[in-house]
Regions:
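N-terminal ligand-binding/catalytic initiation module
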Residues: 1-122
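Glycine-rich phosphate/diphosphate-binding loop of Rossmann-like nucleotide-binding domains
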Residues: 126-208
Length: 208
């Protein structure tokens, strides 16, 4: 939609088990090729994640190209919702990077094929705490396999990406007395985390 500045890509990777499902993320990609590659990669991952979880749904993912701070709003989200609706239920979306519950509510105005709505509207609410807890449990399982104990105390753990999921994960790790390092490309997110927690900041280029 050139008028609204909406440029989105929906990747449906697999529908053998059911309709494709995966969140929508908004990102200021360097190129359309980068956006397509990301959508393809993420949709493939959703196929495996949904299958492993024993869900009767396939894998899909959507990306919206652009700076969320500049172009995102009700009109854009509703237009995107109409596009999803045009797929007739082949793809269901939900919240991902730079998207909110409110964005899902806007999309819901145009299509029923959306999850992650607010609790007051019968949804599950913010998925970030649950996502973070899943990562936390996976960390403990890995540590137990390697060290024989699932304690994270005194373990050095780096969290790259300090959005909602990263913030909740850091909170869990700090409670377990882990030594937490953090990295993000956005200074405001680093500032918000360092004001809340005692962590060590690492430059993104130094992570690997």
């Amino acid at each position: 939609d050139h008028v609204l500045g909406l440029k989105a890509i929906i990747s449906i990777h697999n529908t053998v088990l059911g309709p494709a499902m995966g969140g929508t993320r908004m990102w200021d990609y360097a190129s359309e090729t980068a956006a397509i590659e990301d959508a393809l990669r993420l949709s493939r991952g959703m196929t495996y994640k949904n299958s492993i979880a024993g869900l009767n749904i396939g894998g899909g993912k959507a990306v919206i190209m652009g700076d969320a701070k500049k172009i995102k709003g009700e009109k854009l989200m509703r237009r995107f919702g109409k596009f999803i609706n045009g797929l007739g239920g082949q793809y269901w979306t939900a919240e991902d990077v730079n998207m909110t519950i409110q964005d899902m509510e806007y999309i819901r105005m145009e299509t029923p094929f959306v999850a992650g709505l607010s609790e007051k509207n019968g949804g599950s609410g913010d998925p970030s705490p649950v996502t973070a807890y899943g990562v936390y449990c996976a960390m403990k399982a890995c540590v137990k396999t390697v060290y024989g104990s699932d304690t994270l105390a005194e373990k050095k753990i780096l969290v790259q990406g300090l959005g909602n999921v990263g913030s909740y994960l850091i909170e869990l790790l700090i409670k377990d007395k882990a030594h937490v390092l953090v990295a993000d490309i956005f200074d405001d997110k680093i500032k918000a985390i360092t004001e809340r927690f005692k962590v060590t900041v690492v430059a993104v280029d130094d992570v690997y």
